[in-house]
Amino acid sequence: MGKYNLILSEYLSFIYNSQSAVQIPIYYSSNSELENRCIEFHSKCLENSKNGLSLKKLFVEYSDVMENATLLSILSYSYDKYNAVERKLVKYAKGKPLEADLTVNELDYENNKITSELFPTAEEYTDSLMDPAILTSLSSNLNAVMFWLEKHENDVAEKLKIYKRRLDLFTIVASTVNKYGVPRHNAKYRYEYEVMKDKPYYLVTWANSSIEMLMSVFSHEDYLIARELIVLSYSNRSTLAKLVSSPMSILVALVDINGTFITNEELELEFSNKYVRAIVPDQTFDELKQMLDNMRKAGLTDIPKMIQDWLVDCSIEKFPLMAKIYSWSFHVGFRKQKMLDAALDQLKTEYTEDVDDEMYREYTMLIRDEVVKMLEEPVKHDDHLLQDSELAGLLSMSSASNGESRQLKFGRKTIFSTKKNMHVMDDMANGRYTPGIIPPVNVDKPIPLGRRDVPGRRTRIIFILPYEYFIAQHAVVEKMLIYAKHTREYAEFYSQSNQLLSYGDVTRFLSNNSMVLYTDVSQWDSSQHNTQPFRKGIIMGLDMLANMTNDARVIQTLNLYKQTQINLMDSYVQIPDGNVIKKIQYGAVASGEKQTKAANSIANLALIKTVLSRISNKYSFATKIIRVDGDDNYAVLQFNTEVTEQMVQDVSNDVRETYARMNAKVKALVSTVGIEIAKRYIAGGKIFFRAGINLLNNEKRGQSTQWDQAAVLYSNYIVNRLRGFETDREFILTKIMQMTSVAITGSLRLFPSERVLTTNSTFKVFDSEDFIIEYGTTDDEVYIQRAFMSLSSQKSGIADEIAASSTFKNYVSRLSGQLLFSKNNIVSRGIALTEKAKLNSYAPISLEKRRAQISALLTMLQKPVTFKSSKITINDILRDIKPFFTVNEAHLPIQYQKFMPTLPDNVQYIIQCIGSRTYQIEDDGSKSAISRLISKYSVYKPSIEELYKVISLHENEIQLYLISLGIPKIDADTYVGSKIYSQDKYRILESYVCNLLSINYGCYQLFDFNSPDLEKLIRIPFKGKIPAVTFILHLYAKLEVINHAIKNGSWISLFCNYPKSEMIKLWKKMWNITSLRSPYTNANFFQD
């Protein structure tokens, strides 16, 4: 404890280093006597600082406070309006500033020209192509780096080398930024024309990326990669990341497998010591050579040399360097193009008549048959979800944009908003709601567009379709996904699997007589040639399905779905280009429909099947697996003979030729040992993930607060670290300090302490120890948690006003009325709350709530006020358990080989001792009988929180709850009267606790919690039949053991003697646990 507070104090002295600056620490304690001393101490500090006296004497006088109380926050003030950044920067700006090469990029605006050359006037200016979109500024980032450098200038040995490497790289950044002056951001952290006009347009986003890279430098190799990327990304804003990461798709095919993990029948990973040789035809080496040449042409030298050196013996031991280069390439930042170029990109492809109609026919038929297969059962059985598809759609309507701003009346309040949910309410109130009519998206009503930016790829456009499209597609797509959930081919949706399962699936069938074909079909998904056969296949499937039922409502659902496909075959988009809005006929498939993911997966599966059926005319092989995962598909083919170089080359060329016959511009590769797809890559029998999450640049702006973004920053840092890209932790902590500080006045600022930011309260931002989620059980921790709970949710006047309007009330009661067969307060209140929560995405409401939250927080950070809360948190439960455990030292041998080489050592060690898990632990209650019963008769999906509440009610209340949702009385009676109900109580509690303990997030998702090796370290004598208590005791013990191992690299064993009398008490408490949402949990969820 306390590392953060120490750095915080040093950081404040670094930033406010003038005479007038003062730091006042604020302490608190759960002990009332000590708490009084804390209050005295604080008021005397304020008194002294007002009179300009030193605080040193007070620190001595109140040493009891400083030793025994807990730091709550630091109040800091300084009269210096600090343009200190510029002053400090000069010290580092000793090098030669970079000069941008203005001819590197094809599109003029992607060259790093002076802003006024790209945008001659303020009216033409837009920051949308370089907006870092993050609530922290370049000056803060520079400060954070300079703080680190100053703190470490006296390091020795290996640490000194790191310091020198980073200093050298920072000199490049500082000199370049200093040449033009540090761009000042406005209150919204944006960079305006006045600031940018005489500076290079991409200066800010480049500097942010460069800082992120240089603060991730440790070794000499890191330094070489970073230097090259920093220097080149200053000029090349378009293709650098793609150039650097391209070779990976071939590199994975060059490494022999010598021992690997495979999936066994029980879907667990098990070690197999098979040897598979990498068989690589010359053609592949030629392609790789071409890629390296392209890199050199673009000015890269060190990176291609590293790859070249590795090629000498292609060893898996040195492969992590290749993985590192691949990950680093993404940290050059997002490629943000103009919308017009993004749209035209897909329309440029030449349409040729010279295509294989037979293959297209087969492709369309496969799509048709798959759609039929997916929906056949629900349609034949007149599934209630397909009957009540409209209601289901309304219940899960998002609060995203509906594409146009409208003026809406809620009671006496008139607002204008683009949000779907508000438009639906307004339309219903005014009799304009017609879900049975799908509006056209033709030349008269072109589709407005959103965008998706990603490093190393072009900007993609997203359709923002009217909400009728969502309602028409929702129910059908949900049914498709349910089918995909138990179909192994759909790697992305397959039931509770994680990426390790997909890894074992590939390695399972690799051998000397098989090869794996992997294809990136992202180009095909958005190509014009895809759209006709794609939509027609879906339409034909829907027509066949409509003949399988006589239910008018199901037929209506299918027809509306069909109508969305028909409309989209004639689609136009609107693109703002300067002041004009261009209408362009857009013939390709874009994201934005509800069906995007499901339908793309269907199409990609159909595509690879079409190609394989062609190839099988020429070769004799068995298809061992076919998988599709997002934009990628792959298949393992097993031949009767050993694979030779000639075979690999022939198959490879035939596959490419087959794709070419459909005019599909795709990257198809064949290998014997590894694959590379967007989500993961397998090389030498080991699995790797790309650690490419940008920290200091964001894709887009949302309505999250600085606190939220600080939590997301930390969460991104953790994910990158697990994947092998480590950024200096002190730097991350410094960013968190900057982003969580609260300004009181111009010169007064409050910085929360570690305790505030790491206790699991509604304000939690990060973990005091990476990878370990701690639930504080000391008096002070529980005290502060209670204090924060008292100010958890803030009211918003606007939201209350909208919620009180008849428009809103009628909407909610219409939903309840359609859903419920009898009164059910839990559900009605749930719907009302959900709808009210959706209003949060309307900016004025979130702003209002944020202001209230900040002012409450300010009060709290200066003096915590507790209230006697009846709420119980998971901390209280663990606090009750803790005293009954005794700890002993233990020993666990390493017994599993490494298969994820990029993991940090301490996490790797645990997997090597207890093994890994290939499944997600169920934490949403969907496996419980009650959840299944509800989904059998109703479109309503209760959350885990609601199930947890309901299952602990009296039996007759549960019956009423079920009956009101349309479950027949006989089923409800049977349920409550059976054993299943008591199993459900346990099951749902278990899910709920797993959910609270974030078992499926961070590094916990990698560990096998049911490992016998882990079990044997825990001894809990069995007393009485309270499975829920036994469960929580075991889970707590496992987490304690694992956390200790992460921290210390050694094992402990736990013995628990839990008194039977306490068990009943604990069991009762366990039914009143409150769940806490925090920026931290939201960030975890956001990762998903």
UniProtKB/Swiss-Prot annotation:
GO terms for biological process: DNA-templated transcription; viral genome replication. Its cofactor is Mg(2+). It comes from the Viruses. Its EC number is 2.7.7.48. Residues 501-687 form the RdRp catalytic domain. Interacts with VP3 (Potential). Interacts with VP2; this interaction activates VP1. Interacts with NSP5; this interaction is probably necessary for the formation of functional virus factories. Interacts with NSP2; this interaction is weak. This is RNA-directed RNA polymerase.
